[in-house]
Amino acid sequence: MLELDLQLASDGQHPDEAQLRRWCELALRQRTADSELTIRLVDEEEGRELNRTWRHKDYATNVLSFPAEIPDGILDIPLLGDLVICVPVLEREAAEQGKTLEAHWAHLVIHGCLHLLGYDHIEEDEALEMEELERQLLAELGHPDPYAGDE
């Protein structure tokens, strides 16, 4: 079971909670434990402030992942972590990259959830593993390869 806390702090258009939940559940299906996570949708000002505070980068980014560092078993429902999605950045990227909003939303939610599971893309081999998993999950949803233009 996934307990999802959706926080809306942006006026931008966004998928409904059921759609966000579907993408999260797909990305998290390898996890057998119940999970709780928060998705906070923010504007550029808050996105920039969070990115500056936590990553020391002075710009708004598309998605930030904050994994919980609480061992399973302490809480009734294991807290997986928080995703912060900057809606204006997501919308701008989708337009610039020629992607549908739905496909880009799905990609960033899945990407963020994989980070909460411990996947990363700092080292090339880890990036290849994470990107391949993203491709597979998005293909299940009928969305194209989000990295097709990067090669």
Swiss-Prot record:
Q: Does the keyword Nuclease apply?
A: yes
Which cofactor(s) does the record list?
Zn(2+)
Q: Does the keyword Nuclease apply?
A: yes
Database matches in HAMAP family: Endoribonucl_YbeY
The record's listing under NCBIfam families reads: rRNA maturation RNase YbeY
List residues binding Zn(2+).
H111, H115, H121
Chain's role: Single strand-specific metallo-endoribonuclease involved in late-stage 70S ribosome quality control and in maturation of the 3' terminus of the 16S rRNA.
Protein's name according to its UniProt entry: Endoribonuclease YbeY
**Recorded E.C. number(s)?**
3.1.-.-
The UniProt entry, under Pfam families, shows: YbeY (PF02130)
Gene3D superfamilies for the chain: Metalloproteases ('zincins'), catalytic domain
Record-stated family = Belongs to the endoribonuclease YbeY family.
Q: Which compartment or compartments is the protein found in? A: Cytoplasm
Tell me which UniProt keywords the record has, alphabetically: Cytoplasm, Endonuclease, Hydrolase, Metal-binding, Nuclease, Ribosome biogenesis, rRNA processing, Zinc
Co-factor remark? Binds 1 zinc ion.
Annotated GO biological process: rRNA processing
Query: What molecular function does GO assign, one term?
Result: zinc ion binding
List all disulphide bridges recorded for this chain.
Answer: none
**Cellular component annotations (GO), alphabetically ordered:** cytoplasm
